[in-house]
Amino acid sequence: MMNNVRKLKHNYKIMNNANIKIALDFLLENSKIGKSDAIEIISFITKIEYSEVLFSQEKVLNKKQFKKIIKISKKLAKGKPLAYILGYKIFRTHKILVNKNTLIPRMETELIVDYVNEFINSQNEKISVLDLCCGSGCIGISIAIENKDKMENVTFSDISKKALNITSKNIENNNLVNWTKVVKSDFLNSIIKQQNKFNILVCNPPYIDFNDVDVDKMTKKYEPKLALFAKDNGLFFYKEAIKNIDKFMDITKNILIVFEIGWKQEKELDVFLKQELGLKYKWKFEKDYFNNLRYLILTK
């Protein structure tokens, strides 16, 4: 207890003459975060561009700014994700708003956009995309921004109205309103009823089994369970989508489906795909940055 009191007094003492270098050191010492996150916090509080923070280390912070740093540090020390504290996450190079109703975009999910971009560049016609279980909309928004000239439309769908509110804000912030659509749907139910057909499906569905003991404790504590867990060993949503491909994909043309999957799910999914699709479609499994099998990619 005495150590905490001393530390607190020290924090308020350095508040009077703290510059950005001191603030960075304070965050690294007290918050269990890396340097890039510490720079992001300083950028957020001071409004200095991220790329300029390290060139501005002698700039003195005012008391209000340093109090904010202490407050953020305390939240981080308790395990609260930085993205939820700041209210956004940089995904690829795009600023994506998030809150407790959306999953935090992960680095490994970024590769989905690369697979889609490669496919789009090989097509001659304009493309219609469905971002299913969209959460914050980070995947569909990145695809839309990076392929504006080739987009027919992008539809964002999720069961959570609160998540879709964040999606809508991200769409507005990136000037994508005119050629995007937001649909509240219990997975594919409303999508199929509307009878729209798509060239591309991207989907990072709930895929963690309810009994999985490997789930990160802080992920389980802070992120929405609705977006994390699925029945049938976490495979329910993949199977539902695959069984209904012809009801929402434009199978008269080239199609691309990219799922993010759990690293232990490849074998079960492969067996199911062989039983359900036979030779009608081609599929492969690809690894993420960390050498884990993370993507199911399906084409016609």
From Swiss-Prot:
Catalytic activity: L-glutaminyl-[peptide chain release factor] + S-adenosyl-L-methionine = N(5)-methyl-L-glutaminyl-[peptide chain release factor] + S-adenosyl-L-homocysteine + H(+)
GO biological process: methylation
Residues holding S-adenosyl-L-methionine: 158, 187, 204
Class of enzymatic activity (EC top level): transferase
Keyword Methyltransferase: yes
InterPro entries: DNA_methylase_N6_adenine_CS (IPR002052), HemK-like (IPR004556), N5-glutamine_MTase (IPR050320), PrmC_N (IPR040758), RF_methyltr_PrmC (IPR019874), SAM-dependent_MTases_sf (IPR029063), Small_mtfrase_dom (IPR007848)
Binding positions for substrate per the UniProt entry: 204-207
Protein family per UniProt: Belongs to the protein N5-glutamine methyltransferase family. PrmC subfamily.
Main function: Methylates the class 1 translation termination release factors RF1/PrfA and RF2/PrfB on the glutamine residue of the universally conserved GGQ motif.
Designated name of the protein: Release factor glutamine methyltransferase
Source species taxonomy: Bacteria, Bacillati, Mycoplasmatota, Mollicutes, Entomoplasmatales
The gene coding this protein: prmC
